[in-house]
Amino acid sequence: MTINGIDALPMSSVKTAVTIPGLVQNWDFHCDPVPRWRRRQTVEMAFARACKSPAWSVIKPVVAKAAWTVYFLYSPDGVLSAAHRFTLARMRDSGVNLLVVCTTREPALVPAELHAYANALLWKGLEGYDFSAYTLALRQISKKSSGADVLLFNDSVFGPFSDITKCVTQSRWDFTGFTASSTIAHHIQSYAFGLKAVNAARMLHLAPVFFPFFAVNDREAAILLQEVRLARVASRSMKVGAFWYGDANDLFDPTMVRPFELIDAGFPFLKRSLLGRGAEYQDSERVRAVLQGLGHPL
């Protein structure tokens, strides 16, 4: 496939000669100091923002496979968007083992057409943010498909527009991010990431962010308690890195400030927020034109 005049490549195959202003390619994660006040804030927020773990059920079970791709789909009323269908079709056509975690108000609202796309399908209730879906998926895989490599992403992105099937297996890291930032602290951005060899021990090491007994129900808490801490917690027991890193002193968010350059470099996603709360970062008409050029139905 060709994107913007270049051949689209899996992220693990992007040539090291690619240069994007303000971004570092193939970045190894390292912890930065955590001030005492932030540690206190983390504890206080966990107590203040915790909610019960979401209700869930297995619709189509996980079975033993070498690798899984997890797609978290939020559809409270059970209606799939054109963007959802585009993503699901790309995953089906790529031949991956796809686990869909679908959030609706009740199990009966899970769209029946998901069965045609998903090798495994879980329903999740409205409680909890996206990390509660990740937790559910990873726990099921650790039990039913122990040792599998797992790529996870959510529906905050358009795409994928290039091959993501080997992003985890060919990565040099155990925990792989697509992009990383130093906003708040060095962290992997959680819209998409991969974990090698997911098993019970791995989940135990990651329990400080993939909460086994509760969830959080708002964006700020999910960012501060889970996204920002995920790479730090993971680095205690595994190698961690990202394909692209942006220092917050140079740019706020790689996916918002350099989206078109990333796409030209073979990056598989565009953030949906470029047409929403982050629309001030890029011209919306250009975003739509790029999506149209990529064959996306919007």
Language-model segments: residues:
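ER/Golgi luminal nucleotide-sugar-dependent glycosyltransferases, focusing on the catalytic module
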Residues: 2-298
